[in-house]
Structures are given as C-alpha cells and as structure tokens.
C-alpha cells in the first residue's frame, strides 16, 4: 500500500507502448532487409537473365502527407520504399541499373497505431506455438507407451520422430506414412559408420538399423521417395531434389532464428543462428534425446507453457506479409522475363510495385489481427495495443479451442494477466500483457525480479528479466512478501514458486522476488483499488468496463486510485508533456509554444473536438499559463479522460447502499437529478455523415440547393451550394446536403410515362437523393469537409465530390443508461429522483446514487465498500489516496485497519463520519418524510463510470418502414429501422393458448400479406371493418422454391356454389400460374368431389 508520504515501489513501469514500437523499429531496421535478401536474386526459367536487388542500398522516402494532413484527407500515412536493382544479361550485354519503386508501407505513428485510409488501426500481438523440438510420451489403445518428438519449423515441413512399441525409431514427414529413421539418414548421404559413431545408445538403435544396413544410398533415396510421393515414379535424383526443397531450401524451409535458438538450447548444440535449415547434427541430436527420453524419467513438454509459446508482434507479422508480396513479385518478374523480348526489357518495367501493395493492403484490410482501434477512452487504446490473441492465421480456431488452451497456466505469472479477458466465446483466447511484461528478441515474454541474497532484497541493483523457462530453476517470492526498511525479508519462512509449484522455504533460500504486487495483472486490472478483496469474475468485469467508459464533459480523477493513473495518461499520448525546458510564450486553445533559453521555439498542437473511432469526442485543453516556466516532462495539456495528468474516466459520486421502494431491485440504480443538472455524467458524441457526388451513365450528380418539390423551410439551414451551415441545430429528417441524381426513362412509374407521352411534359429528369439526418439523431453541426477533384483531392474513380458532415450531440445521463463502478458492480438507471426526495446525510448533503446492498454479498466484490469509505474520508481530509493492491504484507486485515484509521482521522473534522457503534455506517434521513431511517447505512464516495452502452443508441420503435423484397416482411435491426420478429417460439405460445385469430392476423395482415395489409390500412382510415386476411407472401415464396425443385405444387380452396351441387376447386395462385400449359391445369382440377345425395 502507498501512503501519502512515501512510495515503496521505486521501480518504474516500462513504457506501455514499447511492445508495439520496438517491434516496428525492428521491422524497419532488420526484418524488411532480411526478407529482401531472400529474394535478392531473381533468375528467369532459362537462366539467361538475372535481376539483382542491392539490399544495402534501399531508401525510405518520408511520408507524402503529415499525420494531420493524412487524417484530414482520409489518406494512408505511409513511407515509399525505393531499392537499387540491376538487370544482368548472362550472354554478355551490358547490365542495366536503376533505382526502382517497390511500394508504400504504412508507417507507425508515435502512439503505436497505423493510419489507413484516414482510419486509425492497430495490429494486435499473436501468441503461437514456438518453433523447436517437443517431446511427448502417451499410451496407445493397448496401453503401450509411444515416445514422439515433433520438430516444428517456422515455415515449411513439420517432422515427427517416433519410438513404437517394438523399440524401432521412425520418422514421419508431414502426412506421409512413417518409415525408418536409418533409411532417412542414409538417404541424406550419411554412411553406416558415421551414423553409428554419432548415436549414443548404439545397442538400442541396432534394432532399427539391422534390417536396412545393407541398403545403398540410392536404394534408400528410392524408398524415401516412395513414401513421400507414392503417386510419382521413384528416382534417386528426384528424391534428392525433393529432400532439398523440403529441408535445405531456405525459401521453403525455415526454422527461424527462434527455432534455431530453441533447437540449440534443447539439444545443447552450438550451431550458428544464421543456419536456419536442418543439419545432420540436429537430426542425430533429436534421435539421441528421444532415446534418452525413452529410458529416463523426463517430463513431456507442455505446449501451453509460455516457454513453448511466443509472441508474433507487428514487426514479424508485417515481415511475413512482405514475404508474400515479394513472392508474388518474383512470379510476375519471371513471367515478364519469359514473355518479353530481352532487348525491350527495362528494370522499371520488370519491377511492378502492385503485388507488394496488394499484399500490404490485404493485411491491413482483412487480416483478423489488424483491428479498428478502440478509442473509447485512453485506457481502451492502451489495452488494445497490449492485447494478445491466439486467434488469426497460424493460430487456433475459436471453435476448436478447448478448456486447456483457455485456462490460466502457472508460467503466465507476471507475463499474461489472469484476470483481464473477454466474457463469452473468446474467454481465455484473448488476453492482455501484464504491467511489467516485456517481449524479448525471440518473442518470449519476460518479467522482472529483484535479486535476493541471504534474505535481503537488492533493490539498488537493476531488476533481472527472466523468461518462463529460465525462472523454473529459481525460487521466486511474490511481490507482496513483507520486508523491513533495509529490504530484509521479515518472515523466517517464505512461500515461493519453484518449478510450477508453491513451496515454503527459509528466507535465505529465496533467489529472486517480484518487483511489485501488481506485476501479475494487466494495466486495466491494476487500476482497481482493493483488488484483492474482489472475486476474480467481478474483477474481470471491472477491468473490461473501465475500457467502455465514455469520456465525460468534466473529467474527475479518482479520490482512491492505485498510482498507475498518471503513467496510463502519459503513455496513452492523451496528456501532452513538455520535451524541453523553457517559458510558455504563446498560449491558445489550439497551440502551446515553449521557448528555451537559446531562443528555440517548440510548438505543441492541441486536438480540438475531433471524432474518435467510437464516435466519442477527443479534445485537449492547456494546463499551463502564459509566460509560465516549464521543465522537461511537465504537463502542458490535459486530454480526453485525463485531469492534471491522471486518468479520469468517471466521477467521484456520493453513494449509499440501501433499497429505495424497489427501484434499485436487480442491480438498478436510483440517481439524483444533480447528476443531470450539474452535467456530472454528461458526454459529447460526434457522428459523421457522408455523401458522394458520382459520375453516372446519365450524367453527373449535382450538389445543389435547388431541389424540386421541397419547401423553403426545409432549405433554410442550407447555404447557396446546398450544404448545411456549420453551427446549425438539426433534427431527424433535416436535409444536410442537397443532391440531385439524373434518372432515365426506366425510373418513371407507368402513369408518369403515359402523362409524358400524352402531354409531352418536360419535367426535370432528376431524382432527389439528398442526404438527410436519420432517425434517432439530433445535434449541432460541428464541421463540414468538402473533397473534390477541383481541389486536387484523391477520390475513387467515378467520384466527383465527397462531403462529410460532423454532428455533435450532448448526451446527459438518463433512465436506461448503463453505469458501473470499478469492481464489476454494474447497473441500469431506473429512476431519476428530485434532490429533495433523496436520503440525506447529517450535514444535509443529499446522496447522489442509491445502490442495492444485496448486490454485494453474493458477488463477493467487497473492494467497493473499502473504496467508497476511503473516498468519503478523502473528501473530508481534502486528500487523494493511492492504494496498491495485495497489502497483506502490512499486517492481517491491513485494508480494514487503514480505512478505519483514515475515517477516524476524518471524524476529527466531521464527527458523524465515523461511529464506533457501527463503523463505516451512518444514520440517514428520508428526504420524502423527513424522518430518520431505522438502521444505519453504508455511505461513501465511489468512482462511478458512465459506459458506452447508452440508451439513445439502443432504444428503437417502428410504425412504418422498409420491407424485404423477397419475403415482403419487415427488415430486422435498428440500423435498418426494422421491426420485431414473431419467431417460431412465439407462434407456439399463441398456438398453445388457442389464439387462432390473433395468430392469423400476426402472420398475414400485420406481416407479409401485401394485398391484405393495404386493404386493412384503407379500412382503418375509412372506419370500415377489417377485411379477411389473404395469402402471405412467404407462403408463395415457399411454393416457388418447391416448384424450382420440379415439384408441381399449388394451393387451392373449395368454393361451394350451392349446398347440393358440385363443389369447385379454385387455384389461389392462378394469376401466378398463367404461363403453365392448359393440360397441367386440367389435371389439377380433377380433384373434385361427387354430389351429395
């Protein structure tokens, strides 16, 4: 726990964005060059031409637009790659050399994002099985143990080695049948003596080699070929080529530098890291280790251990995509070399940048690891950049992931957060990097520890980072073990982690200690105070809901925090910090200029009322005054959801745990109207509306104010060009941009064509296709952006003009909005009470929110009680508290003692704050009756968030609206202004009650009986009785489907002409069946009954 005087944890967190930035820097410096080297020479099929890329001489040109310009123009923020290429004619002609354009590569911004077509995107980290060798022992159906070793490569063939029940060693390559390892080694060129000299347990291996010792290398090659390609005729030369392609061609087989590192580590080899193909030493080492594994009690490798799983970050993912693009480029170059006459070939015509550009575009546009960035608030941004997923190409499919993959593994301690993960189908598949976690050069997650020597923690030395494999050989104490002021462990016996178990050892045996108690959890979870008093399920909800909190009009930093709020705000990039010492010489709401002692000026531009990806408002405001002296790292401006450089996603609200006339039943909240009138939970939301003016076959569409058949009142808010004025207040149905589209003859109704033919009427051949504000939105026009070809803007082919209108809405809190605390205590607002009706404190202050006390015991999130009571004390002491979770090192029930002591301190100023008879509770007065409640009530200041699930975005009603063309039934969903579906279960319910007429009405005239619903509307308008329903359109669709399957089926009704005469059958779909031949119709009519006697 941190008190107000000293900070126990001196060690700062790493920069929270390093996971993204370091990986992309590696890609630009090394990864891109490595991929280029693989394709540095491209030869044609005949070997006459050769194209060389000089990988040392590639240049990166600066972006065409600045970041702000790219955002404004909806462009991609990217760099242009040029490389020197040389075309060599092997028959003797002079080589050509030229600098060629290879393609555009999106450039990462300072905040770790990519701007693609004006939209901020993020590449999330993928966790995959690491290349290397994995040993496994399992019993077959007969209970006999089979020993296997799987060699996983980074790219190319997977190989499996196996010892079967007869103690024979086999090899299995991809999906081919297994065959003797001895035959395979001989096929690679090793002779019997070389093999026997290399194998450690030669007597055991003799069983495998006995039958094949007499075979020649050529015979072995033929046998290998027959196993790998049984459908092809076996030849020794063909097998050599096949083995080369599978194991020794670096383009097709690659262990990767990680695979080589793991292989060297597992087999105790010293092969150079640049050798990424298989060697005979690898194969012999694997066989020796497998035989050792057969006899010695070695534990099978755990694939879910983080030592066997690695992170593929943005740099590696992009390098893989560059390889795909260069592969396509190589194919294109070879085809052009083969088709074109050599004398006409030029370097710049050979190298086409399109394959690489298409590959990059494909990656950013459709890869599941490239995601639309969550910009709801700064914490959501940071967490999204630190996300780790097992899904995506090369990962695990969601529907095939079992419980073992999703479960928490002991090796995740301090690396992947055990709390923060989504609820639902992705639970356990998507995680978050822990606060102190760092990804090393090989992609393994490391976490820091302090060295412990003779029971003393050496905090003066820098911490040591250990990966999951390295830490298993040490005894590691948790970060919440108590130490004295000299860093000596207080307890003689300490619980430690050792080889995935918890054991108790003496303090002198401890090797390392974690640097912080919050080392185990992620950033969002570490922002929950008193986390250790919450059930893990509720902590998970609290972590996820902090990311869904809407930025409020007035940011308010929490009274009770954990100490990480300032770093979160700083690393998110929302808070602007000074990068030089000096004096503020210019200050406005859009710009701060700081001048240093040498007269150099540094300009800091502020973002003003910009729309985020989630339609929330991004805004920054200065925190310094004119001519103020500033230091390096000092806060210059606060951003969205930050206050004085601290994360502020909610409001400190006075709450009471008490029922109120049933209105807070089942997690509902009763709130004070003060939240509404004082704008405590008011937020700004900005929506974008876009319209294009295109070039059609009948002419260009026109943006204009001159709209036919539109009254002047509807045009009053438009300027002379037909575009809405900035600052106008708009309601649903208002015209934002006037547009006319030319229409052809086919667009007219039949009666319109007739009128034109008779009278020769020359009406305007245009259709009104103006952009109107859709249902459920109103607000003020914040900005209008116009892009046109006349202004040299990049527009898609066929588009003449694009107009974007931004509308700002101020949303106050209302009934139906979702609010939550930081401990998973969420609820919907059920009633807004006048402040005079709310219960009030002894000093007359009315409570702001009433929560149901029954929501605490069963949920076991008691942290909220500690938080609200400490918040109450903080308010009266005019202080803020930073409470690090896991505080038992300070004594038993340390949280309870600390909160009680703080309340007693506050009671010196306000005696009613703390009562010895019922600590943490006080007597409240009912605002409606003026009488005191019978029992004392828990009251405090809690941090309450307004979540992005706003009722304005959810509530929906439909009277009339669009229908589906085929079924003629209303569309579904709010976006389509749809209706509610009466599904099969609802039909069953009405059938069960025997409500036949209600059901018939719902399935016909209220749904898809086209004629019936028009007649019903007419009857309602004129006051006539409701007519009888007809045939639903969906039934006709069903008949058409069956007729498409060549089933002659139709619907009939029997019409009685008289009671005693012959009945006739009338075809209900006769108007639809007019095209069918008369004989078929006659056959259908033979189903008549005889007369009644």
From Swiss-Prot:
One of its GO terms (molecular function) is ribonucleoside binding. Keywords: Chloroplast, DNA-directed RNA polymerase, Nucleotidyltransferase, Plastid, Transcription, Transferase. It catalyses: RNA(n) + a ribonucleoside 5'-triphosphate = RNA(n+1) + diphosphate. Its main location: plastid. GO terms for biological process: DNA-templated transcription. It comes from the Eukaryota. It is found in: Plastid, Chloroplast. Its EC number is 2.7.7.6. It is an enzyme of class 2 (transferase). One of its GO terms (cellular component) is DNA-directed RNA polymerase complex. In plastids the minimal PEP RNA polymerase catalytic core is composed of four subunits: alpha, beta, beta', and beta''. When a (nuclear-encoded) sigma factor is associated with the core the holoenzyme is formed, which can initiate transcription. Belongs to the RNA polymerase beta chain family. HAMAP family: RNApol_bact_RpoB. DNA-dependent RNA polymerase catalyzes the transcription of DNA into RNA using the four ribonucleoside triphosphates as substrates. This is DNA-directed RNA polymerase subunit beta. It comes from Emiliania huxleyi (Coccolithophore).
């Amino acid at each position: 726990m941190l008190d107000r005087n000293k900070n126990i944890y001196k060690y700062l967190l790493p920069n929270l964005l390093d996971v993204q930035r370091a990986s992309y820097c590696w890609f630009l410096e090394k990864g891109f060059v490595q991929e280029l080297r693989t394709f540095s020479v491209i030869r044609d099929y005949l070997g006459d031409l050769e194209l060389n890329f000089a990988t040392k001489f590639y240049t990166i040109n600066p972006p065409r637009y600045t970041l702000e310009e790219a955002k404004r123009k909806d462009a991609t923020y990217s760099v242009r790659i040029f490389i020197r290429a040389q075309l060599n004619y092997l028959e003797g002609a002079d080589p050509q050399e030229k600098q060629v354009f290879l393609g555009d590569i999106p450039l990462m911004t300072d905040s770790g994002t990519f701007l693609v077509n004006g939209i901020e995107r993020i590449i999330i980290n993928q966790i995959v099985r690491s290349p290397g060798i994995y040993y496994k022992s399992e019993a077959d159906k007969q209970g006999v143990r089979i020993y296997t070793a799987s060699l996983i490569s980074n790219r190319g063939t997977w190989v499996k080695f196996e010892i079967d029940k007869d103690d024979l060693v086999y090899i299995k390559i991809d999906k081919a049948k297994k065959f003797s390892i001895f035959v395979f080694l001989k096929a690679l060129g090793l002779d019997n003596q070389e093999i026997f000299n290399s194998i450690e347990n030669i007597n055991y291996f003799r069983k495998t080699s006995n039958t094949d010792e007499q075979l020649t290398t050529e015979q072995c090659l033929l046998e290998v070929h027959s196993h790998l390609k049984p459908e092809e005729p076996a030849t020794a030369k063909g097998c050599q080529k096949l083995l080369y392609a599978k194991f020794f061609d670096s383009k097709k087989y690659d262990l990767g530098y990680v695979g080589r590192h793991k292989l060297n580590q597992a087999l105790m080899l010293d092969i150079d890291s640049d050798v990424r193909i298989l060697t005979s030493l690898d194969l012999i080492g694997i066989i020796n280790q497998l035989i050792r594994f057969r006899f010695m009690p070695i534990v099978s490798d755990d694939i879910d251990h983080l030592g066997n799983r690695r992170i593929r970050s943005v740099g590696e993912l992009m390098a893989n995509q560059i390889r795909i693009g260069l592969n396509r480029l190589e194919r294109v170059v070879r085809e052009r070399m083969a088709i074109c006459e050599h004398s006409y070939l030029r370097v710049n015509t050979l190298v086409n940048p399109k394959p690489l550009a298409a590959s990059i575009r494909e990656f950013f546009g459709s890869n599941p690891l490239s995601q639309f960035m969550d910009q709801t608030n700064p914490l959501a941004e940071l967490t999204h950049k630190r996300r780790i997923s097992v899904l995506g190409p090369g990962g695990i499919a969601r529907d095939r992931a079992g419980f073992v993959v999703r479960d928490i593994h002991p090796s995740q301690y301090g690396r992947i957060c055990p709390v923060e993960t989504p609820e639902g189908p992705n639970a356990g598949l998507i995680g978050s990097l822990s606060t102190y976690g760092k990804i090393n050069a090989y992609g393994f997650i490391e976490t820091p520890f302090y060295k412990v020597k003779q029971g003393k923690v050496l905090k003066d030395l820098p911490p040591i980072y250990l990966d999951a494999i390295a830490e298993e050989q040490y005894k590691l104490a948790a970060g919440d073990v108590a130490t004295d002021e000299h860093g000596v462990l207080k307890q003689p016996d300490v619980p430690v982690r050792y080889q995935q178990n918890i054991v108790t050892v003496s303090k002198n045996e401890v090797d390392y200690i974690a640097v912080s108690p919050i080392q185990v959890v992620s950033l969002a979870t570490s922002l929950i105070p008193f986390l250790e008093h919450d059930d893990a399920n509720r902590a998970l909800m609290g972590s996820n809901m902090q990311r869904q909190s809407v930025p409020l009009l007035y940011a308010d930093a929490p009274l009770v925090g954990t100490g990480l709020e300032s770093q979160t705000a700083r690393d998110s990039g929302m808070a602007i910090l000074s990068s030089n010492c000096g004096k503020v010489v210019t200050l406005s709401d859009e710009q701060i200029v700081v001048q240093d002692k040498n007269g150099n000026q540094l300009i800091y531009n502020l973002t003003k009322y910009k729309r985020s990806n989630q339609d929330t408002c991004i805004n920054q405001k200065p925190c310094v005054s004119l001519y103020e002296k500033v230091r390096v790292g000092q806060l210059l401006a606060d951003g969205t959801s930050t206050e004085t450089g601290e994360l502020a996603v909610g409001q400190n609200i006075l709450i009471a745990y008490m029922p109120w006339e049933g209105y807070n039943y089942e997690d509902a909240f009763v709130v004070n109207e003060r939240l509404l009138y004082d704008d405590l939970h008011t937020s700004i939301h900005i929506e974008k509306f876009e319209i294009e003016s295109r070039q059609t076959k009948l002419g260009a569409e026109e943006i204009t104010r001159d709209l036919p058949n539109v009254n002047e009142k509807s045009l009053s808010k438009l300027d002379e060009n037909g575009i809405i004025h900035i600052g106008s207040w708009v309601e649903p149905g208002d015209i934002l941009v006037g547009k006319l589209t030319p229409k052809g003859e086919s667009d007219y109704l039949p009666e319109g064509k007739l009128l034109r033919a008779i009278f020769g009427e020359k009406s305007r051949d245009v259709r009104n296709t103006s952009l109107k504000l859709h249902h459920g939105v109103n607000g003020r026009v914040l900005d209008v952006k116009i892009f046109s070809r006349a202004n040299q803007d990049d527009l898609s082919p066929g588009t003449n003009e694009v107009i974007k209108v931004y509308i700002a809405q101020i949303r106050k809190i209302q009934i139906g909005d979702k609010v939550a605390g930081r401990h998973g205590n969420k609820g919907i607002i059920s009633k807004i009470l006048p402040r005079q009706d709310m219960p009030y404190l002894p000093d007359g202050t009315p409570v702001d929110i009433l929560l149901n006390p029954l929501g605490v015991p069963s949920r076991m999130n008691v942290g909220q009680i500690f938080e609200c009571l400490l918040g109450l004390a903080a308010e009266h002491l005019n202080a803020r508290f930073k409470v690090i979770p896991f505080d038992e090192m300070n004594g038993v029930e340390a949280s309870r003692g600390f909160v009680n002591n703080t309340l007693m301190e506050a009671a010196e100023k306000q005696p009613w704050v703390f009562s010895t008879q019922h600590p943490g509770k006080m007597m409240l007065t009912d605002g409606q009756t003026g009488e005191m409640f019978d029992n004392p009530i828990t009251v405090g200041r809690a941090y309450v968030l307004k979540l992005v699930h706003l009722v304005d975005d959810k509530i929906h009603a439909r009277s009339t609206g669009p229908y589906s063309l085929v079924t003629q039934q209303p569309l579904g969903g709010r976006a389509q202004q749809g209706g509610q579906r009466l599904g099969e279960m609802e039909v069953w319910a009405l059938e069960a009650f025997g409500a036949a007429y209600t059901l018939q009405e719902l399935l016909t005239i209220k749904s898809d009986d086209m004629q019936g619903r028009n007649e019903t509307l007419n009857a309602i308008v004129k006051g006539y009785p409701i007519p009888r329903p007809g045939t639903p359109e969906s039934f006709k669709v069903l008949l058409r489907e069956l007729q498409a399957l060549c089933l002659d089926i139709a619907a009939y009704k029997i019409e009685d002409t008289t009671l005693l005469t012959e009945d006739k059958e009338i075809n209900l779909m006769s108007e639809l069946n007019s095209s069918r031949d008369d004989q078929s119709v006659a056959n259908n009519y033979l189903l008549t009954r005889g007369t009644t006697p």
